[in-house]
Amino acid sequence: MANLGCWMLVVFVATWSDLGLCKKRPKPGGWNTGGSRYPGQGSPGGNRYPPQGGGGWGQPHGGGWGQPHGGGWGQPHGGGWGQGGGTHNQWHKPSKPKTSMKHMAGAAAAGAVVGGLGGYMLGSAMSRPLIHFGNDYEDRYYRENMYRYPNQVYYRPVDQYSNQNNFVHDCVNITIKQHTVTTTTKGENFTETDVKMMERVVEQMCITQYEKESQAYYQRGSSMVLFSSPPVILLISFLIFLIVG
């Protein structure tokens, strides 16, 4: 990782050094640096077209083109273009920033903290797993009633647990408890068979949620290690210096 950061630093130093030299090279004279002047800004003895008296071309008493008494273009008595006494700076108002749908989708995918559950988050919806319980009756019962079981799990961040088993155990307990309370409130009760099947289903979903959260946590940790290495910090500081300077 350190060698990679060093090579990146060497490449960027060489590239930005060339760009810095290009920016500092003097440029040849451009518009209004000694060449012809336009319009009507020649030497005192030079010819000017159109002849300039008290105002511009076609202006008897000064003002813009086609303005008898001064003012903006097409305005007989002053004012900005298309406005009786205002200015053209009032045409547009800054638009209000809109909330990015990508940001909203990203926040939803990361899991929303559930109020009143002590820091638990609700995971995204999953497809209920196909599970075999060892006999035809329970398999058929599960297929017919799987829609009554949770398709989302409650969980806490993985860094609050020492291993996967603790995460899954806590995830199963809180998910079944919340789902049972919600369903019972609606007047529906679960049998022992339902509870047995829910435990299996929720356990599989909690394992999937743990794997997903562990991978995301590892990726965040790897990014922090990369950007905290001394070569990368030096490289970023050098780039900021070149941009600001």
From Swiss-Prot:
Basic residues biased stretches: 90-101
Binding-site residues, Cu(2+) 3: H69, G70, G71
What this protein is called in its record is: Major prion protein
Q: Which species is this UniProt entry from? A: Chlorocebus aethiops (Green monkey)
Where is Cu(2+) 4 annotated to bind?
H77, G78, G79
Residue ranges for the region (4 X 8 AA tandem repeats of P-H-G-G-G-W-G-Q) are 51-83
What is the annotated signal peptide range for this record?
A: 1-22
- Proregion residues excised on maturation: 223-245
Q: According to its record, how does it sit in the membrane? A: Lipid-anchor; GPI-anchor
The subunit field of the Swiss-Prot or TrEMBL record says: Monomer and homodimer. Has a tendency to aggregate into amyloid fibrils containing a cross-beta spine, formed by a steric zipper of superposed beta-strands. Soluble oligomers may represent an intermediate stage on the path to fibril formation. Copper binding may promote oligomerization. Interacts with GRB2, APP, ERI3/PRNPIP and SYN1. Mislocalized cytosolically exposed PrP interacts with MGRN1; this interaction alters MGRN1 subcellular location and causes lysosomal enlargement. Interacts with KIAA1191.
Name the UniProt key words of this record, in alphabetical order: Amyloid, Cell membrane, Copper, Disulfide bond, Glycoprotein, Golgi apparatus, GPI-anchor, Lipoprotein, Membrane, Metal-binding, Prion, Repeat, Signal, Zinc
The UniProt entry, under SMART domains, shows: PRP (SM00157)
Q: Tell me its family.
A: Belongs to the prion family.
Its job: Its primary physiological function is unclear. Has cytoprotective activity against internal or environmental stresses. May play a role in neuronal development and synaptic plasticity. May be required for neuronal myelin sheath maintenance. May play a role in iron uptake and iron homeostasis. Soluble oligomers are toxic to cultured neuroblastoma cells and induce apoptosis (in vitro). Association with GPC1 (via its heparan sulfate chains) targets PRNP to lipid rafts. Also provides Cu(2+) or Zn(2+) for the ascorbate-mediated GPC1 deaminase degradation of its heparan sulfate side chains.
List compositional bias (Gly residues) regions by residue number.
52-87
Q: Where is the lipid attached (GPI-anchor amidated serine)?
A: S222
Could you name the domain of life of the organism this protein comes from? Eukaryota
Binding annotation for Cu(2+) 1: G54, G55
Which parts of the sequence are annotated with region: Interaction with GRB2, ERI3 and SYN1?
Answer: 23-222
GO MF terms here are: copper ion binding
Q: Which cysteines are joined by disulfide bonds?
A: C171-C206
List the SUPFAM superfamilies hit by this protein, alphabetically.
Prion-like
Q: Name one Pfam family in it.
A: Prion_octapep
